Swiss-Prot record:
PROSITE patterns: ATPASE_ALPHA_BETA (PS00152). It catalyses: ATP + H2O + 4 H(+)(in) = ADP + phosphate + 5 H(+)(out). Coiled coil: none annotated. One of its GO terms (cellular component) is plasma membrane. ATP binds at residues 169-176. This is ATP synthase subunit alpha. HAMAP family: ATP_synth_alpha_bact. The record marks 373 as: Required for activity.
């Protein structure tokens, strides 16, 4: 088939008339220098603070320093293939991570990418890692308990849903153990848990994940891991990513618990980034806004009211409050709680659980110092039965510590002092607890009632824990109905108390311990 010249020219003309190009306006810049994961870029005139920047090879960065003629950005990932002269583009987006129930049971990095080898995560939603905390009007007071299963915490420093309770202590004092036990005890409590590991050894994180799997806790837990080998940028961002994942549940009228292990290493990572960006250093070489990085993170842990949840879900969820409870961990050096970061976080949180090296080495584990551990809002959330029976525990320990110091000098002690010392020794022994063995509310109530009513008085202190364990086993097999009632009502009525006392007497009469 031959085409005439006129037909060819008509065809070309029609093609030219219908030709269209879609132009995309994008700000571009050029890499000036790359050092230690920090990139200086020239030419990104419209970049926003905290905006994602795209490098060649599908690598992204975060704009942190906006200067007159250059931009300082931190690279999220490997920077070996980035070199001077590379073209950089603005994305117009803020960093987001995947959120939703699809992440539960998985181990992800600070960007929400799976690192457990179990395949991709098909999350339907993503959310910004930096969000404004709920305002005062949107909040509700803390009134529901978080049962940690640890006697010393639930009786002396109770934690409520929506609270921020700091766990602080030197290295190797059992901080992670307390937090992991609290996660294990949330089984069947309608609580989604997020464990954020910051700057830890990969082997340590793997060990925690294995323990959570062994106790069936990964069924309701998300692990966000930024190990010591990850770039400082990811260690800095991991807590915010974990918090966003927790807020997904909070905002939909559910309860979530998040553990930041630990925020000291996040502050170190931020200090490293800030110094490399040439920001002016302040106290202990931290930048001036190190308080703000922790306050804006921890203020996002809250209990939100029904109206907030209803508005957020467009009326799909009604009459439900949501909560995000935070257990931040801070590592001190030689017990110095007056250092910069510890004092910052103490002032932000609603109380602290202070773990001491001396107590830990003396075999008192969890090594909680009852004198300076406090819960500022958790008292209102404590379960009725523990509040009723555990009131004397803190007092007994405080009196014991005081009297024990004097007893070293006094040779002859009066009867009252001797009784107080004996009771203090007993309570100290009873507050000991094995790792990965959280107790139910009823088991705790049994121990506290037996201690209050003098059932331990004729038991040698060294045998107290064996007596307690045997008593729990006996009651579970013979008097399970009483324990079930305590667990379901979280209270102990007069008749139930008498029945429980009779059951303990039955145990003492018929069992060797």
């Amino acid at each position: 088939m031959q085409l005439s010249t006129s037909e060819i020219s008509e065809l070309i003309k029609s093609r030219l008339e219908n030709f269209s190009t879609s132009a995309e306006a994008r700000t571009q810049g050029t890499v000036i220098s790359v050092t230690d994961g920090i990139v200086r870029i020239h030419g990104l005139s419209n970049v926003m603070a905290g905006e994602m920047i795209e490098f060649p090879g599908n690598v992204y960065g975060l704009a942190l320093n906006l200067e007159r003629d250059s931009v300082g950005a931190v690279i999220l990932g490997d920077y070996e293939n980035i070199s001077e002269g590379d073209t950089v583009k603005c994305t117009g987006r803020i960093l987001e991570v995947p959120v939703g129930p699809e992440l539960v049971g998985r181990v992800v990095n600070a960007l929400g990418q799976p690192i457990d080898g179990k395949g991709p995560i098909n999350a339907k939603l993503t959310d910004k890692i930096e969000k404004v905390a709920p305002g005062v009007i949107a909040r509700k007071s803390v009134s529901q308990p978080v049962q940690t299963g640890i006697k010393a915490i639930d009786s002396m420093v109770p934690v409520g849903r929506g609270q921020r309770e700091l766990i602080i202590g030197d290295r190797q004092t059992g901080k992670t153990a307390v937090a992991v036990d609290a996660i294990i005890n949330q089984k069947g409590q309608n609580m989604t848990c997020i464990y954020v590991a910051i700057g830890q050894k990969a082997s340590t994180i793997a060990n925690v994940v294995r323990k959570l799997e062994e106790h069936g806790a990964m069924e309701y837990t998300i692990v966000v891991a930024a190990s010591a080998s990850d770039p400082a940028a990811l260690q800095f961002l991991a807590p915010y990513a974990g918090c966003t994942m927790g807020e997904y549940f909070r905002d939909r009228g559910q309860d979530a618990l998040i553990v930041y292990d630990d925020l000291t290493k996040q502050a170190w990572a931020y200090r490293q980034i800030s110094l490399l960006l040439r920001r002016p250093p302040g106290r202990e070489a931290y930048p001036g806004d190190v308080f703000y990085i922790h306050s804006r993170l921890l203020e996002r842990a809250a209990r939100v009211n029904e109206e907030y949840v209803e508005k957020f879900t467009n009326g799909e969820v009604k009459g439900k409050t949501g909560s995000l409870t935070a257990l931040p961990i801070i590592e001190t050096a030689a017990g110095d709680v007056s250092a910069f970061v510890p004092t910052n976080v103490i002032s932000i949180t609603d109380g602290q659980i202070f773990l001491e090296t001396d107590l830990f080495n003396a075999g008192i584990r969890p090594a909680i110092n009852a004198g300076i551990s406090v819960s500022r809002v958790g008292g209102a959330a404590q379960t009725k039965v523990i509040k009723k029976l555990g009131g004397g525990v803190r007092l007994a320990l405080a009196q014991y510590r005081e009297l024990a110091a004097f007893a070293q000098f006094a040779s002859d002690l009066d009867e009252v002092t001797r009784k107080q010392l004996d009771r203090g020794r007993l309570v100290t022994e009873l507050m000991k607890q094995a790792q990965y063995a959280p107790l139910s509310t009823s088991e705790m109530a049994v121990t506290l009632l037996a201690a209050n009513k003098g059932f331990f008085d004729d038991v040698p202190v060294a045998r107290a824990l064996a007596f307690e364990s045997a008593l729990h086993s006996f009651l579970k097999s013979k008097y399970k109905s009483i324990l079930d009632k305590i667990d379901s009502t979280n209270d102990l009525g007069g008749d139930d108390e008498k029945a429980l006392e009779a059951a303990i007497q039955d145990f003492k009469a018929t069992n060797a311990y």
